[in-house]
UniProtKB/Swiss-Prot annotation:
Summary of the function given for this chain in its UniProt record: The replicase polyprotein of coronaviruses is a multifunctional protein: it contains the activities necessary for the transcription of negative stranded RNA, leader RNA, subgenomic mRNAs and progeny virion RNA as well as proteinases responsible for the cleavage of the polyprotein into functional products.
Name of the encoding gene: rep
GO biological process, one term: methylation
Full protein name: Replicase polyprotein 1ab
Nidovirus-type SAM-dependent 2'-O-MTase domain span: 219-518
PROSITE patterns: AV_NSP11N_COV_NSP15M, NENDOU, NIV_2_O_MTASE
Pfam family, one: CoV_NSP15_C
GO molecular function, one term: mRNA (nucleoside-2'-O-)-methyltransferase activity
Keyword Nuclease attached: yes
Active site: 104, 119, 159, 263, 347, 391, 424
Residues annotated as site: Cleavage: 219-220
Gene3D superfamilies the record matches: 3.40.50.11580, Vaccinia Virus protein VP39 (3.40.50.150)
Keywords of the record: Endonuclease, Hydrolase, Methyltransferase, Nuclease, Transferase
């Protein structure tokens, strides 16, 4: 019509039309993607977009289109999708590609303590239909390319956030085939894919010429943080300088909220999702509690998070005031106790250059001084079944801490979202099983793997999760606590410890000398 005429006469213009002019270059927007006043149009015509620059038609880029379906009201739109919902997993994988990692990516590994894979809406729908899944949407914007869900599988295997995409399954399989053909000889590759004209990065890992996993590198902006994917634990990286893509990018916190309050809030939010033991009269030790403000913000957050009746002991080398039950002002090396703890948190920071940093005055004597003490404290004073979170950075770390982490039922490196633009992470060990002689990956290699993860991933900084405090409190799990002799520590006992169902340590009253008073609980 008239719009078409004036478009053809203009040098620079964009035409959006329901007419398809085959002789000109265009992009097609399927009608099912169209939204009017927040309502998606159930039946409408496809739209065609044409663009002219300097009097000539421009070839517009190709993109994959999301389908805009939610997993609750999912309807298949192709034979491939119907096959996926009707066929057995074995038959579907056999028919459409054994080497595409479909078991992980489409079907999801539901039998692990942390749900693996499951990166498509149709995959979620399949599990939902079989009553194998509960999910709660956490982003409700229809303009997001990715949808984010809290996912809970019926056997308790869970994932904090599942980031899924709703592409037509035909398009998704073709995308996987193209990735495999182009990059299959690599070990890993970040592949940028245009979806709804947004550039989405897919992290892809290959093994023996097949895709092992392929997931969108997009965790929602309100996540409490990022934990290192399992695959980075088994790499064999060489130590390189930390070169974080968004290093030093600031974050605006609400007025009156200290960085450490936000950071500890996110650390606690993450620990709440693990199998950390929470007994009655829990005992928590917090190292490096002080701050340059003379207060202990981390202890305040911990006290708010921990159940009623928990004993919180904190310590720092610099003077500070604290909400903890017991505060010890001293060099950590001087702090000794016979008692064992259920959770140990450390925010101590040092590095091998600490003398120079402190103008010749030794606030602490470097990594060996601080972290060898901390390692020996964990070995001697962490209850079996207990957990720990120790702050490390590129230069403030020690290989012995990675050894202890590998003696836990599970471990990871966790970066809080508020501080994701620094090299800081908490080394988290969940459910300590005691010193073992099992073969471990060297701490140097693991630290290099951590740096490698940080160097090749952009972690979005965000403070959103600190507003999500309705369910902040750590749930009292009433984990049983027993004091066992060595010969009583059977396989059954270790299985209970491994699952976070038992703590082994001294029981009864504790006595601590605080800098202000003697405290017996």
């Amino acid at each position: 019509g008239g719009g078409g005429q004036s478009f053809l006469a203009a040098d620079n213009a964009v035409l959006v039309s329901t007419q398809c002019y085959k002789r000109h270059s265009y992009v097609e927007i399927p009608s099912n993607l169209l939204v009017q006043n927040g309502m998606s149009l159930k039946d409408g015509a496809n739209l065609y977009v044409y663009k002219r620059v300097n009097g000539a038609f421009v070839t517009l880029p190709n993109t994959l289109n999301t389908q805009g379906r939610s997993y609750e009201t999912f309807e298949p739109r192709s034979d491939v999708e119907r096959d996926f919902l009707d066929m057995s997993e074995e038959d579907f994988v056999e028919k459409y590609g054994k080497d595409l990692g479909l078991q992980h990516i489409l079907y999801g590994e539901v039998d692990k303590p942390q749900l693996g894979g499951l990166h498509t809406v149709i995959g979620m729908y399949r599990l939902l239909r079989a009553n194998k899944l509960n999910a709660k949407s956490v982003t409700n914007s229809d303009s997001d390319v990715m949808q984010n869900y809290f996912v809970l599988a019926d056997n308790g295997s869970y994932k904090q956030v599942c980031t899924v995409v709703d592409l037509l399954l035909d398009d998704f399989l073709e995308l996987l085939r193209n990735i495999l053909n182009e990059y299959g000889t690599n070990k890993s590759k970040v592949v940028t894919v245009s979806i709804d004209y947004h550039s989405i990065n897919f992290m892809t890992w290959f093994e023996d010429g097949s895709i092992k996993t392929c997931y969108p590198q997009l965790q929602s902006a309100w996540t409490c943080g990022y934990n290192m994917p399992e695959l980075y634990k088994v790499q064999n990286c060489v130590m390189e300088p930390c070169n974080i893509p968004n290093y030093g990018v600031g974050i605006t916190l609400p007025s009156g909220i200290m960085m450490n309050v936000a950071k500890y809030t996110q650390l606690c939010q993450y620990l709440s999702k693990t199998t950390v033991c929470v007994p009655h009269n829990m005992r928590v030790m917090h190292f490096g509690a002080g701050s340059d403000k003379g207060v202990a913000p981390g202890s305040t957050v911990l006290k708010q998070w921990l159940p009623e009746g928990t004993l919180l002991v904190d310590t720092d080398i610099v003077d500070y005031v604290s909400d903890a039950h017991v505060s010890v002002l001293s060099d950590c090396n001087k702090y000794k106790t016979e008692h064992k703890f259920d959770l140990v948190i450390s925010d101590m920071y040092t590095d091998n250059d600490s003398k120079r940093k402190h103008g010749g005055v030794i606030a602490n004597n470097g990594n060996d001084d601080v972290f060898i003490y901390l390692s020996s404290f964990l070995r001697n004073n962490l209850a079996l079944g207990g957990s720990f979170a120790v702050k490390l950075t590129e230069t403030s770390w020690h290989e012995s801490l990675y050894d202890i982490a590998q003696d836990c039922a599970w471990w990871t490196m966790f970066c809080t979202a508020v501080n994701a633009s620094s090299s800081e992470a908490f080394l988290i060990g969940v459910n300590y099983l005691g010193a073992s002689v099992k073969v471990k990956v060297s701490g140097k290699t693991l630290h290099a793997n951590y740096i490698f993860w940080r160097n090749c991933n952009y972690l979005q900084t965000s403070a959103y999760s600190i507003f999500d405090v309705a369910k902040f409190d750590l749930r009292l799990k009433a984990t049983p606590v027993v004091n066992l002799k060595t010969e009583q520590k059977t396989d059954l006992v270790f299985n209970l410890i491994k699952c976070g169902k038992l703590l082994v340590r001294d029981v009864g009253n504790t006595s601590f000398t605080s800098d202000s008073f003697v405290c017996t609980m």
